[in-house]
Amino acid sequence: MNIKELAKKLGLSITTVSRALGGYSDVSEKTRERVKKYANKYQYSPNPYASTLASGKVKTVGYVLPIYGTNTSTLNQGNFFQFISGMSEELLSESIQLQILFAKSEKEELKAYEKLITEHKIEIIVLQNIKTNDKRIDILNNYKINYVAWGKTKDKRNYSWVDLDNEYAIEVIINYLIKKNHTHISYINISEKYNFANERKSSFLKNLKANKINFNPNYYASVKLEEPENSFEVIKKMLTKNKKISAIICSTEFSALSAIKACNYLNYKIGKDISIITFDGALVRDLSSPPITAVSFPVKELGKRAINILLNKNKNKNQPINYLAKTEIIERGSVHIVS
């Protein structure tokens, strides 16, 4: 139970309930006792952030939304907004505010975090798009800011994070393709400066080897997140020079869109001449016939988990809390069986 639900049961405002639990004298003793009785009955334990309502100060969670590179496209913004939706639901239930700043470049993004801390006095922050070595984590640690990350650095330092199990996801994809007799598998990744891209590449190589498939470097490409328009040319050239490729794995929906365009340009029939499977896929699924098969994961749930971790860290003596989400393949017809 959260404070909003408790207040509703009591027929009181959230502030009154919070101040009653805090023992404030401006709330009558009778009301304080009644609130405590109900709190015990429903095993409600106020979290350290919602309880600041008692002093009239509402905590705010800070979030920086990048709007450069592929993130200028609705194909990639969808994930961010699902994540924000999950965060918002949890924050709303605790009457905690969310402040979002936008950044048009990587440099501007770093400044935005500094601004949240120094100008807006934000003490709780959620990070995303974690890099292999991420300067933002050093900034937040230096300011002693409470934060949780959507993603993890290569060294998986001592901080809380939520993430997709990227290595497992690639394993699932490779096994799925091999069951359909694919051995000439290409992978369109993004820049390995992002740690999830590193994890996916590592798993790609590992699982090819585990299935006795030699890695062909001509079947692999990484596209800069800041230059998404290049992916069409990259995929077109790859398919033109490597006629044996039977399946394309796309790390983002933007590269999936480029793969669809490249296949159409080369007159390849998706689901017959060549297969495409992408991460996410909700926004590109109907942009080809047949629709694109995808690896789905619960982005909204990751947003909820991130906030739950922030709200419960003090109960765990500030020990880092981590959560890995599993994936599932949603078949839509774009992956064929190789005869």
Where are the model-predicted features located?
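Hinge/beta->alpha junction and helix N-cap segments in small-molecule ligand-binding domains
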Residues: 70-80, 100-108, 162-172, 188-234, ...
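Flexible loop/turn connectors
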Residues: 232-339
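Amphipathic helical "hinge" segments at domain boundaries
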Residues: 45-111
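Short, well-structured alpha-helical segments in soluble
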Residues: 109-121, 231-243
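Short acidic capping loops at alpha-helix termini that bridge into adjacent secondary structure
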Residues: 183-184, 215-219, 270-276
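Flexible loop/hinge segments that line or gate small-molecule binding clefts
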Residues: 128-168, 254, 280-292
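N-terminal helix-turn-helix DNA-binding module of bacterial transcription factors
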Residues: 1-59, 339
